[in-house]
């Protein structure tokens, strides 16, 4: 079941027990993907708990998100209140 997360909730998931990243408006659990990431675990650990959108699109195409996204996506990012 998909959840809605705030940025602060995603930020809580930044250690070896639970690592989430944000890509666009999606929230992805990368905890069990670290060893499978072709670029290594280090960069994923550095981005854990953060918005990785710019970094992701700098190095990956749409096909990467299509391939892994459905397995890793745990929810969406809540819209920030606009003043």
From Swiss-Prot:
Residues 2-78 form the Cytochrome b5 heme-binding domain. One of its GO terms (molecular function) is metal ion binding. GO terms for cellular component: intracellular membrane-bounded organelle; membrane. SUPFAM superfamilies: Cytochrome b5-like heme/steroid binding domain. It comes from the Eukaryota. Heme binds at residues 37, 60. Keywords: Electron transport, Heme, Iron, Metal-binding, Transport. Belongs to the cytochrome b5 family. This is Putative cytochrome b5 B11H24.095. It comes from Neurospora crassa (strain ATCC 24698 / 74-OR23-1A / CBS 708.71 / DSM 1257 / FGSC 987). The lineage of its organism: Eukaryota, Fungi, Dikarya, Ascomycota, Pezizomycotina.
């Amino acid at each position: 079941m998909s959840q809605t997360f705030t940025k602060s909730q995603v930020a809580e998931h930044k250690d070896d027990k639970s690592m989430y990243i944000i890509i666009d408006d999606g929230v992805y659990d990368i905890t069990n993907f670290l060893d499978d990431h072709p670029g290594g675990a280090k960069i994923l650990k550095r981005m854990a708990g953060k918005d990785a959108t710019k970094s992701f699109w700098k190095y990956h195409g749409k096909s990467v998100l299509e391939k892994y996204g459905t397995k890793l996506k745990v929810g969406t990012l809540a819209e920030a209140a606009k003043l």
